[in-house]
Amino acid sequence: MLQKPRGRGRPSTQADPERDWGGAGEEGPSTSRAAGGSSQGSRASLSAPTVGPRTQKQLELKVAELVQFLLIKDQKKIPIKRTDILKHVVGDYRDVYPNLLKLAAERLQYVFGYKLVELEPKSHSYILINMLEPVEADAEMRGDQGTPISGLLMIVLGLIFMKGNTITETEVWDFLRRLGVYPTKKHLIFGDPKKLITEDFVRQRYLEYRRIPHTDPVDYELQWGPRTNLETSKMKVLKFVAKVHNQDPKDWPTQYCEALADEESRARPATASAPATSS
């Protein structure tokens, strides 16, 4: 089971492990502003009575899902169609779509450094503009070929870590389907997603992929590979997950403690092997 985040000020409700990486928890007031209004105003409109039985937590999770979807779709710099957003993410939340998009735009800009821009009013398509310096953008999350792994791979790494460092392939696809990524369908950006995750990422040593014995139907499990441990860390991945949910990494106490221990173990050999300076 995923660990639910610790709420700020009052206990958070139990997160559905099929819906996110561990829940969005409670948030404090935001000072960031989006185009057309303040973040606080947008949050208030999400809480309006028109949303019926939906809870604030459900709406926050939908915003997080939309942010992930936009980040993935932007990988090939092809305009993101509103029809795809409505089909793959928004679903029956169409009545609050403008506010969901506004909050997602705020999070993309103030957390990830991307500005969500509508190409033309009549085109109903969007692009993300990188507001950061090219050298700084995703600097900690690039592979040896300069490709950011903060897209699909980063999401898979986050799923693995938040599920206790091992996740079944079935659980991965249950999550990715909500982002419009299917194991049996060719994807515009990723080509063959199943091959990318279970073969390419495995061959590059970002992931380990093993069959789970005595399962019917047959299932597989995924874990971090040795290259992941060299190029990133549990703390960086946890911070990525926290950014998507607009939370603090400490809101997941179990994972945060594990990430801290990982940071300490990484620093220890470097300290021990540091050459002594002569006086």
Curated annotation (Swiss-Prot):
GO CC annotation, single: Smc5-Smc6 complex
Domain of life: Eukaryota
UniProt-listed Pfam families: MAGE (PF01454)
Tissue-level expression: Ubiquitous.
GO biological process: cellular response to hydroxyurea; cellular response to radiation; cellular response to UV; DNA recombination; DNA repair; positive regulation of protein ubiquitination; regulation of DNA-templated transcription
Modification Phosphoserine, positions: S38
PROSITE patterns: MAGE (PS50838)
GO MF annotation terms: protein dimerization activity
Signal peptide residues on this chain, from the entry's feature table: none
Sequence ranges of Low complexity compositional bias: 30-48
Transmembrane residue ranges: none
Stretches for region Interaction with NSMCE1: 52-279
UniProt keyword DNA repair, yes or no: yes
Record region (Disordered): 1-52
Keyword annotations: Chromosome, Cytoplasm, DNA damage, DNA recombination, DNA repair, Growth regulation, Nucleus, Phosphoprotein, Telomere, Tumor antigen, Ubl conjugation pathway
Compartment(s) where it occurs, according to its Swiss-Prot or TrEMBL record: Cytoplasm; Nucleus; Chromosome, Telomere
Domain (MAGE): residue spans on this chain: 59-259
Main function: Component of the SMC5-SMC6 complex, a complex involved in repair of DNA double-strand breaks by homologous recombination. The complex may promote sister chromatid homologous recombination by recruiting the SMC1-SMC3 cohesin complex to double-strand breaks. The complex is required for telomere maintenance via recombination in ALT (alternative lengthening of telomeres) cell lines and mediates sumoylation of shelterin complex (telosome) components which is proposed to lead to shelterin complex disassembly in ALT-associated PML bodies (APBs). In vitro enhances ubiquitin ligase activity of NSMCE1.
Assembly behavior: Component of the SMC5-SMC6 complex which consists at least of SMC5, SMC6, NSMCE2, NSMCE1, NSMCE4A or EID3 and NSMCE3. NSMCE1, NSMCE4A or EID3 and NSMCE3 probably form a subcomplex that bridges the head domains of the SMC5:SMC6 heterodimer. Interacts with PJA1. Interacts with E2F1 (via C-terminus). Interacts with NGFR (via C-terminus). Interacts with NSMCE1. Interacts with NSMCE4. Interacts with SMC6. Interacts with EID3.
Protein name, UniProt field: Non-structural maintenance of chromosomes element 3 homolog
Originating organism: Mus musculus (Mouse)
Lineage, uppermost ranks: Eukaryota, Metazoa, Chordata, Craniata, Vertebrata
